[in-house]
Curated annotation (Swiss-Prot):
Pfam assignment, any one: Reductase_C
Cofactor(s) recorded in Swiss-Prot or TrEMBL: FAD; [2Fe-2S] cluster
Cofactor binding note of this UniProt entry: Binds 1 [2Fe-2S] cluster.
Protein name: Apoptosis-inducing factor 1
Keywords recorded for this protein, A-Z: 2Fe-2S, Apoptosis, FAD, Flavoprotein, Iron, Iron-sulfur, Membrane, Metal-binding, Mitochondrion, Mitochondrion outer membrane, Nucleus, Oxidoreductase
Membrane topology, from the record: Peripheral membrane protein
Residues that, per the record, bind [2Fe-2S] cluster: 97, 99, 117, 120
Domain Rieske: residue ranges: 56-154
Length: 611
């Protein structure tokens, strides 16, 4: 029970009666701050929302054992929830993934209570709703479940959230854990207070910063970014040329302000003094900030080919919102179809080919089959055929001899001449020749790998640099190269999901790494791509390579799962139209429970393996 007395508003005195489980008053608490959490009666400071109980309608046989789930209808409403059976009890959560809204009932659930999204592998805790693996950043709302004597299940629901919407509606079914835990303005301001600086404004940076606050870290957090925007959903750039920050931002600037996360926008870090723990920006001779812990999350920068003419005004890159805006503008101008030449048959290059397929699109690549190194000859050939069905022309096993500029405008490319003599007309040229790690600001302070990345340990600590971590595209991390054998190999993975998970790894070690017996939580690298069909992939072919591919399903119908093997071990899995196979395999890798190559050749169903 709560009584509040207001004296000369807005000052007030708050009294709280403390009760035991039998509702007997045990004492009186005097507090100076307004309460934020709902009381036992369900009353809230704003809206006086009332908790209600709703019966669930579902098929009992669908949740008869641990590791099962179903979509349950909330009787008396138009909504549903995900009902999970795990750890010999029932859990109810929001039914859609907080990443892109995938139906979680079509994903997978483990017997110990992990919910995995069928589309992109985001993982949630069934009991708490907390995010355990990215790409999701918002937690699921959970609902207490009670079982009545007649076997019926009921959930307890607070009918309104702080925004006045039903918590069962899509806009109300997710939670932001960090703002629930951290109170704005509680950051420590002493000179000796801890200060985590993060260089880079991508997914790894955003996840690391938010995770620190989610665990109630009260030191300073500062993010340095070259861009003038908060971190945003970069994969959408190549999948749609979306360039509206309001639709791309992972979080609003106000959200970061509420977490006391500071930004240096439009800022280029040029030097780091590792000995003195100081960061220098631009041409400044004085350090901009000092840090106690540093996370490097600067990602990659596009490769530029040393060919005259590729600096023409109609040659475009795609790495930022500004790039997407320029490319969207030039490809939607009124007029006839444009001749668009994409240099590079990478995932991003061919995602752009899908977006621009209404134009005359040509793709130049050095390999004989797109994606062969990662996906194998069979899958690469099938994807190439799919693009050709959409009118995309390929010029493979080729390279650029020269770029011919317009006779009317020497600053504009007009034709791309290939080494075999073919000439391709070009109104728009897109350079999609991959990226390289952006670590110039380190100078010679740290030894780099051959490809320009930096080596880290299992906690993302940079080897040879005290209190420095690296995540994302720049980090050579010890991923599971052969997951089923437990072996590990350092490799650099340029995946959005990996960047986010490494950000969590680094932040977690900053907070808890000094505790006895500390270990880093494992995750399986997960990747997706829009290639005219939705392609999912998990594993790590890049670390160890593969020597065979087991195909289940039909490549020609684009409904298949492919298992990449080395010997009898599976090192990676991809699928199209076979959800949730890849999400299931992501968990099987973690549990060291993947079937063998021989089993898969006998058409063994990985979905039959209990998690």
């Amino acid at each position: 029970m709560l009584l509040r007395f207001f004296i000369n508003q807005p000052r007030f005195i708050q009294f709280t009666f403390l009760r035991n489980k039998k509702d007997r008053i045990l004492g009186l608490q005097l507090g100076k701050q307004p309460f934020r959490m709902s009381s036992s009666s369900g009353l809230k400071q704003q809206g006086l929302a009332q908790k209600k109980k709703f019966q669930l309608e579902f098929d009992p046989s669908s949740v008869s054992k641990n590791g099962t789930k179903t979509e349950a209808k909330v009787v008396g409403t138009e909504f549903g929830v995900l009902l999970v059976r795990a750890r010999n009890t029932y859990f109810a959560t929001a039914g859609k993934c907080s990443h892109y809204g995938a139906p979680l009932a079509k994903g997978v659930v483990t017997s110990d209570g992990h919910i995995v999204c069928p589309w992109h592998g985001a993982c949630f805790n069934a009991a708490t709703g907390d995010v355990e693996d990215t790409p999701a950043i918002a937690a699921l709302r959970t609902f207490p479940v009670t079982e009545e004597g007649d076997g019926s299940l009921w959930i307890e629901v607070e009918d309104k959230n702080d925004n006045g919407a039903s918590v069962l509606q899509p806009e109300g079914c997710w939670r932001n854990k960090a703002t629930e835990v951290y109170n704005k303005g509680s950051v420590e301001t002493e000179v000796t207070a801890p200060h985590v600086c993060i260089i880079g404004g991508g997914k790894g940076a955003s996840v690391a910063a938010e995770y620190l606050r989610e665990k109630n870290f009260k030191g300073k957090i500062t993010i340095f970014t070259r861009e003038d925007e908060v971190p945003y959903d970069r994969p959408k750039l190549s999948k749609s040329l979306l360039h509206d920050i309001s639709k791309l931002a992972l979080r609003s600037k106000e959200y970061y302000d509420d977490l006391d996360i500071s930004f240096h926008f439009n800022t280029d870090v040029t030097k780091i003094d590792l000995a003195e723990k100081k960061i220098y920006c631009g041409s400044d001779e004085k350090p901009t900030e000092s840090y106690t812990k540093l996370i490097l999350a600067t990602g990659g920068e596009p490769n530029k080919l040393p060919i005259p003419g590729l600096d023409s005004k109609n040659v475009y890159l795609l790495r930022s919102i500004a790039d997407a805006s320029k490319l969207a503008a030039v490809t939607t101008e009124a007029g006839d179809k444009k001749n668009i030449v994409i240099i590079g048959s990478s995932f991003i290059g061919l995602e752009l080919a899908v977006v621009l397929k209404d134009h005359n699109v040509s793709v130049i690549g050095m390999e004989s089959i797109p994606f062969e190194k990662v996906m194998g000859k069979e899958v690469g050939t099938a994807l190439k055929a799919l693009h050709e069905q959409n009118g995309i022309a390929f010029y493979l096993e080729n390279s650029i001899k020269e770029v011919k500029t317009s006779s009317n405008d020497s600053s504009k490319a007009e034709h791309i001449v290939l080494k075999d003599g073919q000439s391709i007309p070009a109104d728009v040229v897109i350079l999609a020749a991959g990226v390289k790690p952006n670590l110039r600001y380190l100078g010679n302070a740290v030894s780099l790998e051959k490809d320009g990345g930096v080596k880290v340990d299992e906690h993302c600590r940079v080897l040879g640099a005290e209190d420095v971590y690296a995540v994302g595209d720049i980090a050579h991390a010890p991923f599971a190269g052969l997951p089923s054998s437990g072996e590990k190999s350092h490799t650099r993975i340029e995946h959005w999901d990996v960047a986010g998970n490494l950000g969590r790894v680094a932040a977690d070690h900053i907070l808890f790494g000094n505790k006895a017996g500390y270990t880093t939580k494992s995750f399986t690298p997960y990747f997706w791509s829009a290639q005219g069909k939705q392609l999912r992939y998990c594993g790590n072919n890049a670390a160890e390579g593969f020597d065979d591919v087991v195909i289940q399903g039909s490549l020609s119908d684009y409904k298949f799962a492919c298992f990449f093997t080395k010997g009898e071990k599976v090192v990676g899995v991809c699928s199209i139209m076979k959800d949730p196979v890849v999400s299931q395999c992501a968990r099987l890798f973690i549990k060291d429970a993947m079937p063998s190559k021989s089993q898969l050749k006998e058409n063994f169903d990985v979905l039959s393996i209990p998690l």
